[in-house]
Amino acid sequence: SIHHQILSSTGYQGTIENKKVLDSILSSLTNKKIDSSKTIVIIFHPGKDECNSSGSATAETRKIWFEELERKLFKITQTKPIYIYKEKEGTEKDDGILTWHKDPNRLIESLFFKYHYPCSSFVVISKTGEFKSYFGEITKEYIWSYAKSLQKK
């Protein structure tokens, strides 16, 4: 559960009580060990909507976009994002580019994304459990900026 939170029109920030439990759930979900001493970035796909099902991006431009996101994020956090969906529809365009995981029992949605925001959203969680989320269309620059600001916490 969350014991401190601030909600704004574009995001949500606070602290999760037990990050180790979240780390364990994410490790099980992804079949990869989540290092509790590192920052976590989750990109959340709410399901197909007008925003995330339109646009002119090709598979190649999406691949380049996500490779750049992951490369620079790794320099900041030594981790890569975890891609989680509520509804799988709309993630097919990333087949062969990203590995999406189903939100276990809607945990990620209930902790960080209580409402459906168009496009996709993200959350950055520090090693101490402090987090900042951003609702709606994501930019690499915002993810990097949030990761840098929480890296020191």
Regions found by a protein language model. Give the residues of each.
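Start-of-domain marker
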Residues: 1-23
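Short active-site neighborhood of thiol/selenol oxidoreductases, capturing the structured segment around
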Residues: 14, 29-55
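N-terminal targeting/trafficking signals and adjacent low-complexity tails
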Residues: 24, 36, 107-108
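Loop/turn elements at helix/coil->beta-strand transitions in domains of secreted/extracellular proteins
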Residues: 37-39, 76-81, 127
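Mid-length scaffold segments of soluble, non-membrane domains
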Residues: 53, 58-86, 91-93
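Thioredoxin-like thiol-disulfide oxidoreductase module
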Residues: 88-118
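A short, hydrophobic beta-strand/beta-hairpin element that forms part of a small beta-sheet core
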Residues: 119-134
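Non-catalytic, surface beta->alpha helical segment in thiol-disulfide oxidoreductase systems
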Residues: 131-152
